[in-house]
Regions:
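Membrane-embedded alpha-helical segments of multi-pass membrane proteins
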Residues: 1, 13, 64-69, 93, ...
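Alpha-helical transmembrane segments of multi-pass membrane proteins
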Residues: 3-7, 41-48, 71
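Active-site His/Glu-centered metal-binding helix of metallohydrolases
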Residues: 8-13, 17-18, 22, 46, ...
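Membrane-interface helix/loop boundary segments of multi-pass membrane proteins
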Residues: 12-39, 56, 76-83
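Central hydrophobic cores of alpha-helical transmembrane segments
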Residues: 36-42, 86-98
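Hydrophobic alpha-helical segments embedded in the membrane of multi-pass proteins
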Residues: 45, 61-76
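Interfacial helix-loop-helix junctions of multi-pass membrane proteins
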Residues: 49-65
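C-terminal membrane module of polytopic membrane proteins
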Residues: 90-136
Length: 136
Protein backbone atom coordinates (compact mmCIF):
# COMPACT_ATOMS: atom_id res chain seq x y z
CA UNK A 1 0.00 0.00 0.00
CA UNK A 2 2.95 2.29 0.75
CA UNK A 3 4.20 2.10 -2.84
CA UNK A 4 0.78 3.05 -4.18
CA UNK A 5 0.25 5.97 -1.80
CA UNK A 6 3.72 7.43 -2.30
CA UNK A 7 3.45 7.33 -6.09
CA UNK A 8 0.07 9.02 -6.09
CA UNK A 9 1.15 11.72 -3.63
CA UNK A 10 4.41 12.45 -5.47
CA UNK A 11 2.57 12.89 -8.76
CA UNK A 12 -0.19 15.02 -7.25
CA UNK A 13 2.35 17.24 -5.52
CA UNK A 14 5.12 17.44 -8.12
CA UNK A 15 3.28 17.23 -11.43
CA UNK A 16 -0.25 18.26 -10.48
CA UNK A 17 0.70 21.14 -8.20
CA UNK A 18 4.33 22.29 -8.48
CA UNK A 19 4.81 21.75 -12.21
CA UNK A 20 1.71 23.83 -12.93
CA UNK A 21 2.68 26.55 -10.42
CA UNK A 22 6.24 26.80 -11.75
CA UNK A 23 5.02 26.91 -15.35
CA UNK A 24 2.62 29.73 -14.50
CA UNK A 25 5.38 31.51 -12.57
CA UNK A 26 7.59 31.49 -15.68
CA UNK A 27 4.57 32.82 -17.57
CA UNK A 28 4.99 33.56 -21.23
CA UNK A 29 8.74 32.98 -21.21
CA UNK A 30 10.07 30.67 -23.84
CA UNK A 31 10.51 27.12 -22.52
CA UNK A 32 8.38 27.74 -19.39
CA UNK A 33 7.04 24.19 -19.59
CA UNK A 34 10.52 22.74 -19.98
CA UNK A 35 11.80 24.68 -16.96
CA UNK A 36 8.84 23.49 -14.89
CA UNK A 37 9.50 19.87 -15.87
CA UNK A 38 13.23 20.15 -15.15
CA UNK A 39 12.80 21.83 -11.75
CA UNK A 40 10.20 19.34 -10.54
CA UNK A 41 12.29 16.46 -11.90
CA UNK A 42 15.36 17.58 -9.97
CA UNK A 43 13.21 17.83 -6.82
CA UNK A 44 11.86 14.35 -7.54
CA UNK A 45 15.40 13.01 -7.96
CA UNK A 46 16.67 14.68 -4.79
CA UNK A 47 13.71 13.27 -2.88
CA UNK A 48 14.88 9.78 -3.75
CA UNK A 49 18.32 10.24 -2.15
CA UNK A 50 16.92 9.27 1.23
CA UNK A 51 15.95 5.81 0.01
CA UNK A 52 19.54 5.21 -1.09
CA UNK A 53 21.34 6.44 2.02
CA UNK A 54 23.76 3.88 3.40
CA UNK A 55 24.50 2.56 -0.09
CA UNK A 56 27.77 3.23 -1.95
CA UNK A 57 27.96 6.79 -3.32
CA UNK A 58 27.77 5.46 -6.89
CA UNK A 59 24.43 3.84 -6.04
CA UNK A 60 23.13 7.05 -4.45
CA UNK A 61 24.13 9.08 -7.51
CA UNK A 62 22.71 6.49 -9.93
CA UNK A 63 19.37 6.32 -8.12
CA UNK A 64 19.16 10.11 -7.98
CA UNK A 65 19.94 10.50 -11.69
CA UNK A 66 17.53 7.67 -12.54
CA UNK A 67 14.73 9.26 -10.49
CA UNK A 68 15.42 12.66 -12.07
CA UNK A 69 15.19 11.13 -15.55
CA UNK A 70 11.93 9.42 -14.58
CA UNK A 71 10.67 12.79 -13.37
CA UNK A 72 11.36 14.26 -16.81
CA UNK A 73 9.48 11.35 -18.37
CA UNK A 74 6.50 11.72 -16.02
CA UNK A 75 6.44 15.49 -16.53
CA UNK A 76 6.55 15.20 -20.31
CA UNK A 77 3.86 12.53 -20.37
CA UNK A 78 1.68 14.74 -18.17
CA UNK A 79 2.13 17.72 -20.50
CA UNK A 80 1.46 15.70 -23.64
CA UNK A 81 -1.48 13.69 -22.26
CA UNK A 82 -2.99 16.60 -20.28
CA UNK A 83 -4.11 13.96 -17.79
CA UNK A 84 -2.50 13.51 -14.36
CA UNK A 85 -3.71 9.91 -14.17
CA UNK A 86 -1.26 8.90 -16.90
CA UNK A 87 1.93 9.70 -14.92
CA UNK A 88 0.28 8.37 -11.75
CA UNK A 89 -0.33 4.98 -13.40
CA UNK A 90 3.17 4.95 -14.89
CA UNK A 91 4.66 5.83 -11.50
CA UNK A 92 2.65 3.09 -9.77
CA UNK A 93 3.82 0.55 -12.33
CA UNK A 94 7.45 1.38 -11.59
CA UNK A 95 6.89 1.41 -7.81
CA UNK A 96 5.25 -2.01 -7.94
CA UNK A 97 8.43 -3.39 -9.52
CA UNK A 98 10.18 -2.78 -6.19
CA UNK A 99 7.85 -4.99 -4.16
CA UNK A 100 9.77 -8.27 -4.73
CA UNK A 101 12.88 -6.55 -3.33
CA UNK A 102 11.01 -5.95 -0.05
CA UNK A 103 10.82 -9.71 0.50
CA UNK A 104 14.46 -10.39 -0.33
CA UNK A 105 17.05 -10.89 2.40
CA UNK A 106 19.93 -9.97 0.10
CA UNK A 107 21.04 -6.59 -1.17
CA UNK A 108 20.31 -7.65 -4.73
CA UNK A 109 17.09 -7.77 -6.66
CA UNK A 110 15.73 -11.29 -7.19
CA UNK A 111 15.88 -12.33 -10.87
CA UNK A 112 12.09 -12.22 -11.18
CA UNK A 113 12.09 -8.59 -10.03
CA UNK A 114 14.65 -7.66 -12.67
CA UNK A 115 12.62 -9.39 -15.38
CA UNK A 116 9.43 -7.70 -14.16
CA UNK A 117 11.13 -4.31 -14.15
CA UNK A 118 12.60 -4.81 -17.61
CA UNK A 119 9.24 -5.81 -19.10
CA UNK A 120 7.50 -2.92 -17.30
CA UNK A 121 10.05 -0.37 -18.52
CA UNK A 122 9.75 -1.59 -22.10
CA UNK A 123 5.95 -1.29 -21.87
CA UNK A 124 6.30 2.19 -20.35
CA UNK A 125 8.58 3.28 -23.17
CA UNK A 126 6.15 1.94 -25.78
CA UNK A 127 3.26 3.69 -24.05
CA UNK A 128 5.23 6.94 -23.85
CA UNK A 129 5.93 6.84 -27.58
CA UNK A 130 2.25 6.05 -28.24
CA UNK A 131 1.07 9.07 -26.21
CA UNK A 132 3.52 11.41 -27.92
CA UNK A 133 2.56 10.19 -31.40
CA UNK A 134 -1.15 10.33 -30.60
CA UNK A 135 -0.88 13.97 -29.55
CA UNK A 136 1.30 15.13 -32.46
Amino acid sequence: MYYIGVGIMEELYLRGLLQNIIEKWFGERENATLYAILITSVLFGLGHIFGALGQPIVTVIAKTVWATALGVYFGAVYVVSKNLWVPIILHLTINLCGIPFCFSTSNQYPAIALITCLVSYILLAIYGVYIIRKNN
